[in-house]
Amino acid sequence: MSTANKSPIDEFESLQSLMNDFSAKFDTALTQKRSAIINDKQLHYVKVNELKNQETQLQSDIEGLKQKEIKVKDTIKRTMEDLQMQQLKVDELARKQDSLLDEKDELQTEIDNLSSQVQTTTDSLEKSSNNLAEQLRKDYPELLKYEQHLGLKIEVIGQDSLKFVFSNIDPNDLDKEVWCELLVGGELFKVGDSFPPLAPDIITLLENEFNHHREFVKFLKTVRALLMDLI
């Protein structure tokens, strides 16, 4: 049955099915992003616990060295004849203690840096995910029209990558497809691979314009036109 002969109910059911498929695709993408964030946090917690265990061991070693130092000093007091040898041992223990204290400071600095890096990454992923979801909700009606009438397919190809595939672009070959990847894992959107390949200056222009206006429909129209010109 052609679109013109469909009843309003049939058209509604068809549109509803497309909307459900579209929502499922992006629910999957967002779920993968959340899973990546959770995995990063878990890895961070494991690393922090390992470093804390190392710190505890170093503190225990330091206390042990302090006890040894006390014993050495007592021996020096009791045996003056062995003063020089015992003093060398004390000096060596002091150097080891300083070295362990330095290692402790370095480990604490590493813990702080790791915490900061994980927090920055988490914030960036959450911000990107929220921005992407909000923009998709805003552009959803127009994206449905593209998917229904212009042969658009949107594929999730990674935890931070989407692939836009266009068909119905060549009247001589209706099955011919062109596509473009979009990286959405950072604060700014990045254009990935495409077919046919886009020139580097065109990719830079696309990224700058899209990150400025943040309108998916406008971006898709531009990409489709550029790829069609390369056929």
From Swiss-Prot:
InterPro entries according to UniProt: Spc25 (IPR045143), Spc25_C (IPR013255)
Domain of life: Eukaryota
GO biological processes: cell division; chromosome segregation
Purpose of the protein: Acts as a component of the essential kinetochore-associated NDC80 complex, which is required for chromosome segregation and spindle checkpoint activity.
Signal sequence range: none
UniProt source species: Debaryomyces hansenii (strain ATCC 36239 / CBS 767 / BCRC 21394 / JCM 1990 / NBRC 0083 / IGC 2968)
Family: Belongs to the SPC25 family.
UniProt subcellular location: Nucleus; Chromosome, Centromere, Kinetochore
Name of the protein this chain belongs to: Probable kinetochore protein SPC25
Keywords assigned: Cell cycle, Cell division, Centromere, Chromosome, Coiled coil, Kinetochore, Mitosis, Nucleus
Quaternary structure and partners: Component of the NDC80 complex, which consists of NDC80, NUF2, SPC24 and SPC25.
Segments forming a coiled coil: 45-130
Assigned GO CC terms: Ndc80 complex; nucleus
Primary site of residence: nucleus
Residue intervals passing through the bilayer: none
One Pfam family linked to the record: Spindle_Spc25
Record's keyword annotation contains Coiled coil: yes
